[in-house]
C-alpha cells in the first residue's frame, strides 16, 4: 500500500478509557493493511499510556500536558502554559510526520495534536464513543472532516454511526470456546461461577466496598469465585484475598491488562459505564452489572449503560443504590437463573454488531483518501 511515511496520527490519553480505544484504532489500521510504523500515537506523559504505548509497538510521542480540574486546584495554574507548549511541540511533530489523517479519540491529551492538525490543514476525524461527547470532542468537531459516533442521535456535525473502537483481539473473542484456557491462564477454577469486577485503570472505591461486603456475606460459598481488579492505588486498602479452600475464592489484583482472557473466563462482570467498556461488553456478548461512575461529566456513564440495560443486555445499578447486599442479591439471582444470564449475553452480543462492523476504519481511510486528493 503506497502511503507517506506516516499514514495516521492517533491521539488521546490520560486514562485507559482513551488510550485503549486509540490503540484499538491503530490495531484496526494495521489489520486493514497499513504498516505499523506508519501509525503514530500521541498521548500524555502522565497517563497509563506511559506503560501501554511502549508495549504496543507503534511510534509514539508523549506530551507534557495536564487536564483542567473542575475543582479549585493548584494543578490548574500549570494547565494553560503546559497546553501552549504541548501544542507548539505537536505542531513541530506534525510538520515532520506529514500524516494523511489525524484521529482524535478525546480527552485532554488529544487537544494539542488535533489543534496542530487543524492549523496545518491536515484532515482529522473525531471519534466520540460516549452518548454525550466530551468537551474536547465538541470543540474539535466543528472543523473535523467527519465525526465517528457509537450511538444514534449524535448532535456532533458530520456524524456517522461507526461503532466504538474495540481491540481486534476482543472483536475476535469466542467466550465459550476460550473459557477453559482463559481460566487456566488466570488460575481460576473450572467448576465455580466466576464474577470479574473491573472498574477501569483507577478502580472504584465505592464498588470495591460493596464487593468486599458481598464477599463477607458469601464467605462460605464454595460455588463462587470473585476476581477483583481494585485499581493500583487501592491495593493497600483492599481486603485480603481468600484461597477458596473452605469457602469463596476471592482474588485481589491491582491492575489487569489481560481483558480478553477476563471476558472469556467470567460468567458475569461488574464494571463502570465508560463507553469503551460498554462497547467491549457488547462486542463479546458478556453479561454485566454496570455501576456508572457518578462523577462523569453530565453523568454520561448512566446514558452509556442505558444503551445496554434498556435492551435487556445488561443490569444497571446506580452507585447510590449499591451495597454488598444488593450486589450479592443480583449476582445470586443470575447465578441460579442461567437462562436469564444467557439472554442478557445474547442481547449484548446483538447490540455489539455495530462495533464489530469495521465501519470506523473505513471512515478513517475515506477521509485520508479525500485529503490526499485535494
Model-predicted regions and their roles:
Residues 99-101, 256, 264-278, 286-287:
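Acidic donor-binding loop of glycosyltransferase active sites
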Residues 340-354:
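A short, well-ordered alpha-helix in the C-terminal region of glycosyltransferases
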Residues 52, 178-184, 188-269, 302-306, ...:
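Donor-nucleotide binding loops and adjacent catalytic segments primarily
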Residues 353-374:
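C-terminal alpha-helical cap of glycosyltransferases
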Residues 89-102, 110-125, 138-143:
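Glycosyltransferases and closely related glycan-assembly transferases
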Residues 5-13, 36-82, 320:
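Conserved nucleotide-sugar phosphate-binding/catalytic loop shared by glycosyltransferases and other
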Residues 120, 264-266, 282-291, 311:
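Conserved donor-binding/catalytic loop of nucleotide-activated donor transferases
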Residues 40, 59, 118-180, 185:
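Active-site-proximal region of nucleotide-activated glycan assembly enzymes
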